[in-house]
Swiss-Prot record:
Residues the record lists as binding substrate: 140
Organism: Escherichia coli (strain K12)
One family name in Pfam for this protein: adh_short_C2
Coiled coil: none
Lineage: Bacteria, Pseudomonadati, Pseudomonadota, Gammaproteobacteria, Enterobacterales
Alphabetized InterPro entries for the sequence: NAD(P)-bd_dom_sf, Sc_DH/Rdtase_CS, SDR, SDR_fam
Example GO biological process: monocarboxylic acid metabolic process
Enzyme superclass (EC): oxidoreductase
Protein name: Uncharacterized oxidoreductase YohF
């Protein structure tokens, strides 16, 4: 029986690229979408072209806990789960002094509560299967350093990083490995870009002087799902073109 990977928010961007690269590795793929059903269907068509199975379902992590139950439907349809990639997320920007509490809670509901519930559903099934598994949380460089005027997003990503470590420690006894991937400035629809925007010298403030491509995140996710990562758990792997190394003394010239 084929292994199964479920990637949340895989209708576009990093999630879609994770789905396609894992399909190339022979995984059957569970695809979720929030508002772009056609994007999810496009992902499914590309996944199936690699000779594996694809199932799609709408996932609304703004409506919890009920919304997360869609993950159970995917697991039932696919028969099992071996990998969960928590890619769904939300963000908003506002100065700390102006941040409304309901906006703060919306970000935490999707980015932290949603990942918690999806991980719990997946991990319980993995324990039941008795063969271990992998859970990968897509965080952000802002898990490690603040984004100005985005206190809710920054705090939520820090919380998801902490949850990653707590899950890793508790689930290792079940051979479930839990890690995070922390992207920097990646050319995704959330950032108003796509991979065509990955051009040399497009972003001089980043030491590599460009935005990242979605496959540069997804390829690390694939590695974390491989035997090569059998000794890796509780880590947050930063992929940022050197962004975290830059400081006021950094001269892009």
């Amino acid at each position: 029986m084929a292994q199964v990977a479920i990637i949340t928010a895989s209708d576009s961007g990093i999630g879609k690229e994770c789905a396609l690269l894992l399909a190339q590795q022979g995984f059957d793929i569970g695809i979720t979408w929030h508002s772009d059903e056609e994007g999810a269907k496009d992902t499914a068509r590309e996944v199936v072209s690699h000779g594996v199975r694809a199932e799609i379902v709408q996932l609304d992590l703004g409506n919890l806990p009920e919304g997360a139950l869609a993950l159970e439907k995917l697991i039932q349809r696919l028969g099992r789960i071996d990998v969960l990639v928590n890619n769904a997320g939300a963000m908003t920007k506002a100065p700390f002094l102006d941040m409304a509490f309901d906006e703060w809670r919306k970000i935490f509901t999707v980015d932290v509560d949603g990942a918690f519930l999806c991980s719990q559903i997946a991990a319980r099934q993995m324990v039941k299967q008795g063969q271990g598994g992998r859970i990968i949380n897509i965080t952000s460089v802002h898990e490690h350093t603040p984004l100005p005027d985005a206190s809710a997003y920054t705090a939520a990503k820090h919380a998801l990083g902490g949850l990653t470590k707590a899950m890793a420690l508790e689930l290792v006894r079940h051979k479930i490995l839990v890690n995070a991937v922390a992207p920097g400035a990646i050319a995704t629809p959330m950032n108003g870009m796509d991979d065509s925007d990955v051009k040399p010298d497009a972003e001089p403030s980043i030491p590599l002087r460009r935005f990242g491509a979605t496959h540069e995140i997804a390829s690390l996710v694939v590695w974390l799902c491989s035997e090569g990562a059998n000794y890796t758990t509780g880590q947050s792997l930063i992929v940022d073109g050197g962004f975290m190394l830059a400081n006021p003394q950094f001269n892009p010239e």
